[in-house]
């Protein structure tokens, strides 16, 4: 699968999937399994969504048939699975969908790079675009991506280093526990005494070698050139300060998400989720929504849930596009020889 280069040619795809995260990738695979052409439009520079960007090294335990799998491995497997249908699949990266409109049964999908054309659309963009919450300190941007990080792609890059982590949620605690095994030292800074993480993870943290600094908040970054060398922290409701020497700083304050373009998509939505029927139809005929982007009674936001929704959405889209076809579902064991 190669990234598409937009041309003036109006190539019309059967289904366009908005979102290249795990659910979007599996949707594209299942569409290929049904023998139709599919395009995936992803706003980021790589496929995989949150597991690839936010927690590639973290282990996921609730994916069927995988007792444990990292975010990166899950994404790699989904991309490998999709490779089977690379001749009928087009990937478009770094494209944000602004609007889409239907005329004569064909959707024109407008992105920041141009127009795409499709007979049906499946929205699988999760909670939308996401960006890290920052420290809000002077010189933060100067150190970002040098030795100040908002997510961890590879644990090995911190081996033998003095690491300071800011945050008190699941990610911060998980990174602290994981890095405790390979870093020279790990210091975890949180503004409250209690952590907002799973109880078991907190218990592991308390028995680790991690230096826990609570309740403290970041006050000042110090550095040389493009690298931070220390973080000054201040105790909450106190004038007391401490300066923490560091080789690497991880800011784990979570990420803010935005589905700001929903308003221009001409579909019914509530807050940042799209209202769907039991068949994952939106208020606009020919447009479907699944995964975290979709909202219905009893919805559970899990990757596994989105995987289960994908075949239904694809099959309904095919019925919409080709109502004259025999659309009985056939098992993959009969479709792939």
Swiss-Prot record:
The record lists FAD as bound by: 42, 50, 55, 97, 130, 292, 333
User: What is the official name of this protein in its record?
Assistant: Ferredoxin--NADP reductase
Q: What is its EC number?
A: 1.18.1.2
- Presence of the UniProt keyword NADP in the record: yes
Named from the GO MF annotations, one term is: flavin adenine dinucleotide binding
**Co-factor binding details:** Binds 1 FAD per subunit.
Give the highest taxon in the source lineage. Answer: Bacteria
Q: Which Pfam families match?
A: Pyr_redox_2 (PF07992)
Cofactor(s) the protein requires to work: FAD
């Amino acid at each position: 699968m190669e990234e598409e280069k937009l041309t003036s040619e109006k190539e019309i795809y059967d289904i366009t999937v908005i979102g290249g995260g795990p659910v979007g990738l599996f949707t594209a695979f299942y569409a290929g399994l049904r023998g139709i052409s599919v395009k995936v439009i992803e706003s980021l520079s790589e496929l995989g969504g949150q597991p690839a960007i936010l927690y590639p090294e973290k282990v996921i335990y609730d994916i069927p048939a995988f007792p444990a799998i990292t975010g990166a491995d899950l994404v790699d497997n989904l991309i490998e699975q999709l490779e089977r249908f690379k001749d009928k699949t087009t990937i478009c990266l770094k494209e944000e969908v602004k609007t889409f409109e239907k005329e004569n049964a064909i959707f024109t999908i407008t992105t920041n790079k141009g127009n795409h054309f499709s007979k049906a659309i499946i929205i699988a963009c999760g909670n939308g675009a996401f960006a890290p919450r920052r420290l809000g300190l002077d010189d933060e941007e100067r150190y970002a991506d040098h030795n100040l990080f908002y997510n961890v792609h590879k644990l090995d890059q911190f081996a033998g280093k003095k690491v300071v982590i800011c945050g008190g949620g699941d990610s911060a605690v998980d990174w602290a526990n994981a890095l405790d095994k390979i870093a020279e030292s790990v210091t975890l800074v949180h503004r409250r005494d209690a952590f907002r993480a799973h109880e078991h993870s907190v218990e592991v943290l308390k028995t680790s070698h991690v230096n826990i600094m609570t309740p403290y908040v970041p006050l000042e970054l110090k550095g040389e050139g493009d690298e931070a060398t220390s973080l000054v922290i201040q105790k909450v409701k106190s004038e007391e300060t401490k300066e923490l020497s560091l080789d690497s700083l991880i800011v784990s304050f979570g990420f803010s998400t935005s589905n700001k373009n929903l308003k221009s998509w001409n579909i019914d939505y509530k807050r940042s989720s799209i209202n769907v029927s039991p068949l994952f139809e939106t208020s606009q005929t020919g447009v479907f929504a699944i995964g975290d982007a979709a909202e219905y009674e009893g919805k559970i936001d899990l990757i596994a849930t989105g995987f289960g929704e994908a075949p239904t959405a694809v099959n309904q889209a095919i019925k919409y596009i080709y109502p004259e076809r025999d659309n009985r579902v056939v098992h993959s064991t009969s479709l792939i020889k």
